[in-house]
């Protein structure tokens, strides 16, 4: 996605965005309208590269009005990766039609029906960093959703929806085994692991929260966890 600034008093409708790689491959998409005096991040399509080149590549992004007239253009840098290496994927969210991304640390072996490890990140951590914190596995794919921005309400509310949208998308793309879907996370992601695990117990074979906190309301209170030790329903290890 890319931000468009409409600094005029009339709406921009029927916009098209053309993305052209440095090798000439191109893709055009009719994108979202931008209302007057508004900044909006809108979707565009990057053409699937047919070359085997890896590393940085340049792309020109051209914004056109509905008549095909050029409004603006910019150049972006992309990292072209092999699907067997750690990489990012995008999808269109059902919440608001926006482009969201998740990171993939793929299995070192080929084939369907492998395990899926959903790893939810801590506060102010990007999915791309989360996925790269793990060594690749030979029996499953590590999938790291990025949430809505770095915090996303502690993986509750809209963060919860993002995590489950990514899970559904990754299951479809990698054709993983639903009986071997696991959930983990660290810090804020540890809280997310508890929250997602108890909200969707039928979706995960096991959960592993790390350095987590059980309750947002108690998170900022001094010695809040220590106060829970005496509660019989919440054993501390």
Residue ranges of model-derived segments:
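A domain-start/cap signature at the N-terminus of enzymes
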Residues: 15, 23-114
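Active-site nucleophile loop of the alpha/beta-hydrolase fold
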Residues: 147, 208-218
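Cap/lid segment of the alpha/beta-hydrolase catalytic domain
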Residues: 124-173, 220-221
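Gly/Ser-rich "nucleophile elbow"/oxyanion-hole loop immediately N-terminal to the catalytic nucleophile
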Residues: 108-112, 156-188, 198-204
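Short beta-strand element of the alpha/beta-hydrolase
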Residues: 112-123
């Amino acid at each position: 996605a890319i931000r468009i600034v409409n600094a005029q008093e009339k709406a921009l409708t029927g916009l098209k965005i053309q993305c052209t790689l440095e090798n000439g491959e191109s893709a055009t998409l009719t994108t979202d309208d931008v209302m007057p005096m508004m900044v909006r991040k809108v979707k565009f399509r990057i053409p699937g590269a047919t070359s085997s080149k890896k590393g940085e590549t340049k792309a020109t992004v051209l914004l056109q009005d509905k008549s095909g007239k050029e409004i603006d253009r910019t150049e972006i840098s992309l990292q072209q990766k092999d699907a067997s290496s750690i990489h990012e994927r995008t999808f269109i969210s059902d919440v608001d039609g926006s482009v969201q991304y998740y990171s993939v640390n793929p299995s070192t072996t080929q084939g369907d029906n492998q395990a899926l490890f959903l790893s939810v990140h801590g506060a102010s951590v990007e999915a791309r960093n989360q996925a790269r914190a793990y060594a690749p596995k030979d029996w499953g794919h590590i999938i790291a959703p990025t949430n809505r921005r770095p915090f996303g309400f502690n993986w509750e509310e809209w963060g919860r929806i993002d995590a489950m949208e990514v899970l559904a998308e990754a299951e479809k793309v990698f054709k993983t085994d639903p009986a071997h879907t696991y959930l983990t996370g660290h810090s804020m992601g540890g809280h997310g692991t508890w929250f997602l695990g108890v909200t969707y117990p039928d979706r995960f074979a096991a959960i592993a929260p790390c350095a987590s906190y059980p309750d947002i309301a108690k998170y900022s209170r001094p010695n809040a966890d220590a106060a829970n030790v005496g509660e019989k329903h919440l054993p501390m290890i």
